[in-house]
Amino acid sequence: MDKISKLSKEEVNERLEVLLKMVLMRLEEPDPGRAIRTFQSVNDRGVPLLLLDKLKSLLIYYSNTFCNGKRGLDQFINDHFGEIFKIFAKIKKSDHISSVGGSKFDEGDIFRYHAGSQRFDGIEFLGHYATSTEDTYEKLKDELKEIKKSKLKSFIQSYVSDLKNFYQAFLDLLSEIDTSPTTLKAMLINTINPLFFNSLIRLKINNELDDETLRLFAKTDIVFFKSGKKMRTTAYNLIDEYLEKGKEGLKSEMIAQCRNDIEDIELASLKLVKNAFNSSCFHYVFFEKNCQEMGLADLKKLIPEKQFSQEKEHIIPINLLKLDNEIKIQELGFEDKKDLENYIDTYGNLISLEKPLNSKGKDKDLYEKNEIYKSSKIPFNRRFNVKDFKKEVLIERNNKMEKWLINTFFKDFAAH
């Protein structure tokens, strides 16, 4: 409308004349199979058909061909997919979808997560962690061919209804980032791997995804994907435990798998502390330990542009190593440059700091950083005594974090 309002009267009339000369043509294909193939191959929008377009047309084809779709199944499919399209439009508009689903996220991803979240009567399990969206769609097409005609209508109804519920549950989880501190930290700060989504969203559908379970998913994600390993199959196949044994069975399996992977919880905690700068779970662990006092409103202040952008701040700056200032290094309690190198990237020398403040404090001395930290939106940072920071304080922070990881954060994963 904005563009039209800027047109002159003559320009408006020119466009109106073009519209009046346009002819609307109706092309009708009586054969449902050919109609569907034509719909999928002829696309006058100039863009590829969405996966949901193809899926809807496929199901309507089976409804028409084998289920006498005019008796209501066509309308059922049409109504439910209308809702699915509306839900996905809201998902795409979410401020958090690129953080949660990844930069290349599309509607096919949710279709794929759903395929691995449920077992439907009459077909083989559709999901596999490494299967692409297109291959999952082709597998569904193959399975539809094998379903007994007497069970086809029931399958289509249950599949379409469950698919809509899955899209809605995915949207609900995204929306909870703005209403729940636990969800914000687990999904936005920790960014749980999508290979958990088949189980995660299935729990959400069944109203079983409470804060405790979501925190367990975040910790399991750290063990499976943020501690040097990539346990893709194990993460994806957790759904088997849920479908067979329910929520408690799923939680027990997650804990058992984490125990098997960690083996030595003390060693794993020490490794996380020593390698904190290179750890992708640093911010989540930092917030869980130091920022429990921060409520939802406080946490949301850290995402002014709807993206979590905290950075790892070296309290003792890295440039001290480059300057090779032995006197300054020794004043901070270190024996020499090599001694500082051993501690520079450990947890004790790091805090989670807002990106603008981190840029402002880069290479500044401790007195200058003290003023910068006071501008942080994180209470822990504002209270942090930077001026008196030395090696002994750094070591104390490392020791406290290590004990907290062992006794609190990873305690459920300790061998009994």
Residue locations for each model-derived region?
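A cross-family structural signal marking well-folded subdomains
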Residues: L52-L55, T65-G69, N78-D79, E83-F286, ...
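Intrinsically disordered, low-complexity N-proximal targeting/linker segments that flank membranes
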Residues: I222-Y343, Y347-L353, S359
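Secondary-structure capping and boundary motifs in well-ordered enzyme cores
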Residues: L16-L19, L27-R34, L188-N193, L209, ...
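Composition- and surface-driven signal marking solvent-exposed, interaction-prone regions
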Residues: F39, L51-K56, L209-K219, K229-A235, ...
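Short, well-ordered loop/turn and helix-capping segments at boundaries between secondary-structure elements
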Residues: D44, P48, I60-T65, N206, ...
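Active-site-adjacent structural elements in folded domains
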Residues: K3-E10, E17-V23, E176-M187, Q257, ...
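Glycine- and hydrophobic-rich flexible loops that cap the catalytic core of alpha/beta enzyme folds
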Residues: M1-F120, E124-G127, D363-D365, N370-A415
